[in-house]
């Protein structure tokens, strides 16, 4: 049974990373895989706010770009925002419901938080360079090439989510099949 807080005493050092017992207290003193806690600490050390960075030079540089350079610059920002939007919610939607290690849960929370900051940083750039940022944001989903690239990442997330839900809710498929989809999704998004 899935629950927000498992009331049973569980030794999480003996649990698999995924599809083990539901989590309870977020203990950060004993780890099965200390590398995840170290990664979380490293990520937290990189915390910054995009608004703290001056973009005056970027704006003047952008104004000097040729039209094709502006197009490439803008398309890249759109793509980065789209991918960071996926990564900002993907780990929580796909992997967290099946996570069974507190240190991995913490690491994934930090991961998606920093993906959100990345997306904010690109938004900060757009807001400082374009007189009407909505023109950029409103056309983001109109670019077929950006959408095609995004589909290549979201496909594996979606396939894992579907397989995991079918397995846990409807009893369809096997745990091995679901874990294969999990592996493919993790490799694809990393």
Protein language model features and the residues they cover:
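Non-heme di-metal
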Residues: 2-190
């Amino acid at each position: 049974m899935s629950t927000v807080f498992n009331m049973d005493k569980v030794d999480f050092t003996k649990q698999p990373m995924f599809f083990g017992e539901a989590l309870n207290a977020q203990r950060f003193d004993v780890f099965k895989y200390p590398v995840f806690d170290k990664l979380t600490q490293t990520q937290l050390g990189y915390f910054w706010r995009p608004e703290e960075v001056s973009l005056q030079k970027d704006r003047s540089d952008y104004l000097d770009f040729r039209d094709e350079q502006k197009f490439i610059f803008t398309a890249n920002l759109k793509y980065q925002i789209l991918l960071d939007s996926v990564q900002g919610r993907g780990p929580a939607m796909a992997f967290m419901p099946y996570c069974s290690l507190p240190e991995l849960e913490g690491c994934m929370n930090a991961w998606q938080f920093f993906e959100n900051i990345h997306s904010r940083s690109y938004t900060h750039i757009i807001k400082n360079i374009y007189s009407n940022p909505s023109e950029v944001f409103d056309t983001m989903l109109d670019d077929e090439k950006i959408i095609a690239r995004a589909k290549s990442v979201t496909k594996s997330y979606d396939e894992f989510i579907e397989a995991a839900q079918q397995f846990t809710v409807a009893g369809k498929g096997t745990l091995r099949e679901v874990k294969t989809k999990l592996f493919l999704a993790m490799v694809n998004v990393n």
